[in-house]
């Protein structure tokens, strides 16, 4: 259900359709970055998210994040676990990013999730909005395991704001040096900051 426009300041009225959500995302800019966890933490706090309903794995690194995350989902499903997967970027449709047991999140679910996320924190970036929508979708899906692929680095990535139990690192190389640092050591240090107290 869409929220009233007054509950989403900064958004021109409620989002009634999947097309409305895509238009809002396009307005945010796919490649716009505003690094920091503040907006994510604000949204999660407003939504009362302190834990997710099952174990959570975050996959960070430079190369092979998406394939590693997909492999973990396949392995989990082979053992009979209901598994949610969040990856980026998408190839054809943003629905590819949010999957439960390999099934993309239906377009019909997007407006309600987007409105709830924006009501909690209107200033979310493209990636942050999709991340919060994913959290809300997975909360409602009764999963056994959730897997989140980090978008960029680890220290300030939106997925690092989520409560997680395990972080997996894929091979680390030179990428996004203007943001993450000039060399492998700096980039590895940024990604290593995805680790939180109590994680495996």
Residue ranges and their predicted role:
Residues 2-61, 68, 74-79, 86:
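Short functional linear segments
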Residues 165-166, 178-200:
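Internal gly/pro-rich beta-alpha loop/helix module
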Residues 1-2, 134, 146, 200:
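Short intrinsically disordered, low-complexity coil segments enriched in acidic
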Residues 31, 37-52, 78-162, 174, ...:
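ATP-dependent carboxylate-amine ligase catalytic core
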Residues 58, 97, 200:
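Short aromatic/hydrophobic contact patches that present stacked aromatics
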Residues 63, 173-174:
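Short histidine/acidic/glycine/proline-rich micro-motifs that form metal-
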Residues 63-65, 90-91:
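Short active-site-proximal "capping" loops at secondary-structure junctions
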């Amino acid at each position: 259900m869409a929220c009233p426009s007054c509950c989403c300041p900064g958004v021109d009225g409620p989002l009634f359709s999947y097309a409305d959500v895509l238009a809002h995302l396009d307005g945010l800019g796919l490649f716009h970055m505003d690094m920091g966890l503040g907006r994510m933490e604000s949204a999660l706090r407003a939504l009362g998210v302190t834990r997710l309903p099952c174990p959570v794995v975050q996959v960070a690194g430079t190369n092979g994040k998406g394939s590693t995350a997909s492999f973990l989902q396949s392995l989990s499903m082979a053992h009979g676990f209901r598994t949610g997967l969040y990856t980026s970027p998408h190839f054809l449709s943003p629905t590819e990013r949010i999957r439960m047991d390999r099934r993309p999140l239906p377009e019909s679910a997007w407006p309600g999730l987007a409105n709830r996320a924006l009501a909690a924190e209107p200033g979310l970036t493209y990636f942050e909005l999709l991340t919060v929508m994913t959290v809300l979708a997975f909360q409602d899906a009764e999963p056994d395991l959730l897997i989140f692929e980090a978008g960029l680095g680890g220290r300030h990535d939106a997925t690092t704001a989520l409560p997680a139990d395990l972080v997996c690192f894929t091979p680390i190389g030179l990428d996004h040096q203007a943001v993450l640092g000039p060399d492998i050591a700096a980039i590895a240090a940024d990604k290593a900051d995805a680790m939180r107290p109590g994680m495996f």
